[in-house]
């Protein structure tokens, strides 16, 4: 289910195709409006350019047990630079394609979606898609913190080539996905004629029993099954609420998983400018060669955070989708106001220790330990489409053996604009 293609060429073709559709537009007049970028629409069709620029600064001060392990890093980096298009051919078919450069690496795709809506409640989607996780489904443009922490690293899957069915009611939804690997991954190419890529199934259901103008309550449950096929074994490796890495691994099981099953819960409550949110995943891992290596372990990961808007805004919860969307700034600088300010504190937790405890033969050292971290966040929005962020993280990994523990003090800044 993997596709290798030129991002630039693909984007150009996509834009040309979408523009040709817009010109046709069934010979109807097209209305124009500005929604962060030019948008053209009539009763049946819509076309819009989209994109984002996220520029980060990261400073890490890392202390490691034992000699020669301490270091400091300081980097400016392009977190995301994306361009794309989205639109609607008619009342039944829609599309989205967006990609660009992430973390200073080569070009790759993010959202690439074809959607078919047979009616208002049902959507059938095909492409590079996320299926579960409250913070995961919330765009990086709108997450309260700069990055999603260990939960986003291995507690839930990011974009995967998938076939997804969704049903949405007024305050509930159900999602089911059949999944492969990312659209950016190379095809599996083993010598065996029967070689195959990873396979996954994900189901999610959410319910918002409270959904008033000032109060929102979100609860959700999801289940994920994965089989690695002939790809590399699943590894459970996390970072310190950042997308930055200098190559140092603070905590990991290494590649151990042949298959796994994940049960996850989500919760969030919004009361005016105050909100609280958390998620937790319990991952049952089936080892490779368990008879030789050891029993099957459980991996646990979760987070919780609290946020508050002193300027009076509230987080924009979509009760039908079970996701958070773009916040509406009450007094943007474009209207002579001061913009919006959000303050937040977050706790992250990951426990990989069972991957070590269940080994038949235990090595003297292992990074399959525990991680805990606290993050303070400040978000300033001059408008709903521009954001400046500051995050400070104090994290600790408690691993096995000498010279394996880390204390991480991390400061990050971000300037962000999207359209």
What are these regions (language model features)?
Residues 36-66, 70-229, 299-335, 340-357:
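Outer membrane beta-barrel
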Residues 2-9, 197-205, 211-230, 254-275, ...:
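Domain-scale selection of a single, long terminal region
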Residues 31-33, 106-107, 156-158, 258-260, ...:
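Short solvent-exposed loop/turn micro-motifs enriched in small/polar/acidic residues
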Residues 1-27:
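Gram-negative bacterial Sec-dependent N-terminal signal peptides
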Residues 17-20, 59, 390:
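Juxtamembrane/membrane-water interface recognition
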Residues 28-30, 74, 154, 254-258, ...:
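Short, solvent-exposed secondary-structure boundary motifs
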Residues 70, 115, 233-419:
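Outer-membrane beta-barrel pore domains
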Residues 27-34, 64:
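Cleaved targeting-peptide boundary
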């Amino acid at each position: 289910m993997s596709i290798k293609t030129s991002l630039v060429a693909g984007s150009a073709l996509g834009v040309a195709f979408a523009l040709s559709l817009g010109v046709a537009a069934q010979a109807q007049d097209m209305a124009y409006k500005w929604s962060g970028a030019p948008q053209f629409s009539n009763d049946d069709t819509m076309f819009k350019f989209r994109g984002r620029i996220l520029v980060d600064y990261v400073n890490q001060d890392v202390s490691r047990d034992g000699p020669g392990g301490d270091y400091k890093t300081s980097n400016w980096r392009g977190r995301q630079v994306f361009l794309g298009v989205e639109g609607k051919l008619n009342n039944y078919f829609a599309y989205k394609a967006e990609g660009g450069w992430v973390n200073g690496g080569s070009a790759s795709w993010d959202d690439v979606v074809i959607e078919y809506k047979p009616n208002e409640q049902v959507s059938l989607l095909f492409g590079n898609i996320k299926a579960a996780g409250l913070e995961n489904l919330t765009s990086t443009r709108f997450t309260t913190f700069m990055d999603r922490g260990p939960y986003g690293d291995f507690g839930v899957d990011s974009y995967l080539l998938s076939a997804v069915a969704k049903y949405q009611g007024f305050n509930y939804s159900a999602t089911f996905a059949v999944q492969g690997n990312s659209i950016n991954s190379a095809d599996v190419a083993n010598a065996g004629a029967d070689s195959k890529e990873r396979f996954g199934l994900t189901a999610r259901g959410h319910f918002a029993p409270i959904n008033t103008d000032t109060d929102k309550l979100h609860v959700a449950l999801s289940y994920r099954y994965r089989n690695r096929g002939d790809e590399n074994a699943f590894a459970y490796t996390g970072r310190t609420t950042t997308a930055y890495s200098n190559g140092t691994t603070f905590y990991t099981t290494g590649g151990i998983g042949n298959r796994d099953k994940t049960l996850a819960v989500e919760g969030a409550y919004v009361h005016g400018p105050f909100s609280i949110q958390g998620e937790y995943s319990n991952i049952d891992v089936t080892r490779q060669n368990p008879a030789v290596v050891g029993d099957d372990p459980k991996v646990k990961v979760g987070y919780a955070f609290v946020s508050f808007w002193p300027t009076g805004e509230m987080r924009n919860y979509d009760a039908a989708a079970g996701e958070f969307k773009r916040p509406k700034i009450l007094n943007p600088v474009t209207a002579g106001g001061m913009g919006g300010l959000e303050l937040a504190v977050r706790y992250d937790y990951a426990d990989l220790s069972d991957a070590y405890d269940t080994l038949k033969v235990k090595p003297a050292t292992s990074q399959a330990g525990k991680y805990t971290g606290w993050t303070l966040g400040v978000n300033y929005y001059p408008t709903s489409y521009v954001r400046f962020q500051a995050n400070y993280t104090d994290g600790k990994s408690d691993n096995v053996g000498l010279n394996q523990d880390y204390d991480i003090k991390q400061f990050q800044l971000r300037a962000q604009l999207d359209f």
